């Protein structure tokens, strides 16, 4: 489930910081990414991850970082949040981590072959983050953005998205952005030429894991705890009706965008 942050600056900031108190929940229950994503990333960048100097920005608890490293990349992580950074260090103590964000990268010019933003570019200001990416990338380097999203051609996921929208008043991303160009949203300046791909995958998890994953999204983290808990309790009933065995098949579309500098 990808829930787009509110455009209100104060609410946006509150949501961006909400993950720090839920870092352990985030690390334990958020979905990973499939091998096909990294195969596609290598195809679009025209270079292997093995041996590449990669900066993973907004690294969070290190879900994407660990997979990049497993592909042989030499990774540096950048993370602004205290709680997320602490969880990252517990999970990946041997991976260099610097504190900062994509709007002002604490890195030297032309130091990276690849900048990655796994589930994090939407927390940046593109007017600042795009020039920073171009500054840090080496000639021929690439910027890669990706998000796990919930495709609404899966009936139970569409029904759940509708319930979330009704209960919390959250605009569904597909409703808001269906006619918008993804590249223009990611880079309103038009300086980057993105190639977009979608990689579908799925995982099977217990109902409790799915609910904990859902509850780790900022829209829930900033809600009154009793309100969020009531929604998740009701959601459990819906899920058990759809999956009486107690195991949920979560289907994801990873939306990947790659721009070569």
Regions found by a protein language model. Name each.
Residues 1-50, 84:
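Conserved class I S-adenosyl-L-methionine
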Residues 42, 66-69, 130, 134:
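A structural alpha-helix within SAM-dependent methyltransferase catalytic domains
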Residues 55, 61-104:
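Class I SAM-dependent methyltransferase SAM/SAH-binding core
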Residues 103-114:
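A short acidic, Gly/Pro-enriched loop at the edge of an enzyme's catalytic core
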Residues 113-127:
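A short SAM/SAH-binding and catalytic strip from SAM-dependent methyltransferases
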Residues 128-203:
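Conserved catalytic/acceptor-binding region of the Class I
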Residues 181-261:
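Conserved Class I S-adenosyl-L-methionine
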